[in-house]
Design a protein with these regions (language model features):
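N-terminal hydrophobic/helix-forming segments and targeting peptides
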Residues: 1-258
Length: 258
C-alpha cells in the first residue's frame, strides 16, 4: 500500500481557523476575472499559494476541437457618466458594471442610442446582472433596473479602457497519488468576477477537499484537482490531457453553484 506524504512548501490551509475561507473569498471576489487575462492568472496565483498547482496555457488562435482559443482580454477601467457629469456605472465600484470582454470605446451619445448597450433585470430591479461578450466585438454597461429607469434624457459619455491581444487561456491542476493510477477528478471553473454561488463556491470547496484529501494517510484512488475558466478552459484541458484522462479516469465531479 502506498503511504502518502503530506504536501509541503505551501501556506497552511486554515480549515480549522475561523474566517479562513471567508477571508480568502473576500480576497478573490473583487479580482476582475474572465476566461483569459491577468485577473484569471492572479486568481490562479492565489490558489497556488495553497495547492501545488501545475500551470499550463493554450495560446490564442489555437484550434481546440471545434473551438478557437480567443484573444486575451484586459480591463483598465470602464466608466459611464450622465448629462450632469454624475457617475452612472464604474468598474472601480463594481466590475460587474462593465460587460465582461467589452471592446474599447470612448463615445458621447444620446440616451436613446445608449439604451441598446445597457443591461438590467426588470424582475430583479435592485440587482446588477453579469453579462459577457466573449466571442464577439461588443460593449456595454450593467446596472440595476431601478437606476436604469431613473436615467434622464441627455448626452452620456461611455469610456471603456480595455484591450484584446494575443495571449492564451490559462488553467491549472494538481495531483495527489494513491495506491491506484485510476483517478478521481474534481474540477471547478474560475472566470467570473464578483459572484459567489456561480463562481467562488466551487473553487473554495475544491480547495477544502484538496486540504482534507491531502491529509489522508492512505488513498486508494489518485485524485486530480482542476481549475480552469468555464467551457474554453475545460476544452483546453481536455485538449492537453485527454489521452491521460481516457486511460486513468475513474470518476469526475464538477463543483459549481454550491
Amino acid at each position: 500500500m502506498l503511504q502518502t506524504a503530506p504536501v509541503t512548501g505551501l501556506k497552511l490551509i486554515g480549515s480549522a481557523a475561523p474566517g479562513f475561507y471567508s477571508d480568502l473569498f473576500d480576497r478573490l471576489l473583487p479580482v476582475t476575472r474572465s476566461i483569459t487575462g491577468p485577473g484569471l492568472r492572479e486568481s490562479l496565483d492565489i490558489f497556488g499559494e495553497y495547492m501545488p498547482l501545475r500551470r499550463d496555457r493554450v495560446v490564442s488562435g489555437t484550434a481546440v476541437f471545434d473551438w478557437t482559443v480567443p484573444p486575451e482580454w484586459a480591463l483598465t477601467r470602464a466608466i459611464l457618466t450622465g448629462p450632469d457629469g454624475e457617475v452612472i456605472a464604474d468598474s472601480d465600484r463594481s466590475n460587474l458594471q462593465v460587460v465582461n470582454y467589452a471592446m474599447p470605446v470612448d463615445v458621447d451619445l444620446a440616451l436613446e442610442d445608449l439604451q441598446p448597450h445597457l443591461h438590467s433585470i426588470p424582475d430583479q430591479p435592485d440587482l446588477i446582472p453579469y453579462v459577457t461578450a466573449y466571442y464577439r466585438d461588443s460593449w456595454g454597461f450593467c446596472l440595476t433596473h431601478t437606476a436604469r429607469q431613473a436615467l434622464k434624457p441627455g448626452r452620456y459619455r461611455a469610456v471603456i479602457q480595455s484591450r484584446k491581444y494575443d495571449g492564451g487561456v490559462d488553467f491549472a491542476d494538481c495531483h495527489l497519488p494513491g495506491d491506484l493510477d485510476r483517478e478521481i477528478m474534481l474540477s471547478s471553473y474560475l472566470c467570473h468576477p464578483s459572484l459567489a454561488n456561480n463562481e467562488l463556491s466551487g473553487p473554495l470547496v475544491l480547495l477544502g477537499l484538496f486540504d482534507r484529501i491531502s491529509r489522508w494517510k492512505r488513498r486508494r484512488f489518485s485524485y486530480r484537482f482542476v481549475l480552469a475558466p468555464e467551457t474554453i478552459g475545460s476544452l483546453c484541458y481536455l485538449f492537453r490531457h485527454g489521452d491521460q484522462l481516457r486511460a486513468n479516469l475513474a470518476a469526475g465531479l464538477v463543483l459549481t453553484c454550491l
